[in-house]
Amino acid sequence: MPNWRDQYLSGIKDAELNNPVNMELVQTCSQMADRISALEAEKNGLETLVTTNGKTTARPTEPSTNDPAVAQLKQDLAEALRSKGVAEKRLRSSEEELLQLRSKHKTNTRSIRDLTADKNSLTTRLKDREYELREKRKFIEQVQDEMIALNLQMSMAEKERDKVKKENKELVDRWMKRMAQEAEAMNLANEPIFKKGR
């Protein structure tokens, strides 16, 4: 059955594979776990050695507290445990920060998706508006061209009307002059008859 260090190390590796947080932190934890394992193995070996060598003494099960190796081992173990606590604290802090960043990432992703949809909608509306404006410009240009053509036609019609009016007036004037001449000629021709009748 794996001990707590192996489980802890395996859990860190699994977490790192599934959710990479901070490789440096994971490596530090792994190194500390290895160091703790080595120190505890060394401690067990020293305790066994002290127990074996001290069977003839009055305290066979307790290693000598004055042994510098044991003291150093305890100091190293305490330092390793302290470093482990610091690393675990940093790991928890990193995991919390990761959760916050993931939550923020989801929010940002949703915002980006919404903004992209708004942008696409506005782009479509803008294209429709540009198309509408182009068509209106074409229509205005057509109307202006038609107005110019109508003005030209009207100007030509007015000139034609003035010409016809002038020709009619000249024709009427000639006809009136002719009628007057014919009337005068008739009067002159009938004047001897009028004189005889008197």
Curated annotation (Swiss-Prot):
Coiled coil: 24-177
One annotated Gene Ontology cellular component of this protein: phagophore assembly site membrane
Gene behind this protein: ATG16
Keyword terms of this UniProt record: Autophagy, Coiled coil, Membrane, Protein transport, Transport
Cysteine pairs bridged by disulfides in the record: none
The keyword ATP-binding is annotated on this UniProt entry: no
Subcellular location as annotated: Preautophagosomal structure membrane
The protein, known as: Autophagy-related protein 16
Main location group: membrane
Domain of life: Eukaryota
Claim: Coiled coil is one of the keywords in the record: yes
Protein family: Belongs to the ATG16 family.
Classification via Pfam families: ATG16 (PF08614)
Purpose: Stabilizes the ATG5-ATG12 conjugate. The ATG5-ATG12/ATG16 complex is required for efficient promotion of ATG8-conjugation to phosphatidylethanolamine and ATG8 localization to the pre-autophagosomal structure (PAS). Also recruits ATG3 to the PAS. Involved in endoplasmic reticulum-specific autophagic process and is essential for the survival of cells subjected to severe ER stress. Autophagy is required for proper vegetative growth, asexual/sexual reproduction, and full virulence. Autophagy is particularly involved in the biosynthesis of deoxynivalenol (DON), an important virulence determinant.
GO biological process: autophagy; protein transport
Native organism: Gibberella zeae (strain ATCC MYA-4620 / CBS 123657 / FGSC 9075 / NRRL 31084 / PH-1)
Deletion phenotype: Does not significantly decrease the growth rate under nutrient-rich conditions. Strongly reduces conidiation. Causes only mild infection in point-inoculated spikelets of flowering wheat heads and impairs the spreading to nearby spikelets. Also reduces strongly the production of deoxynivalenol (DON), an important virulence determinant.
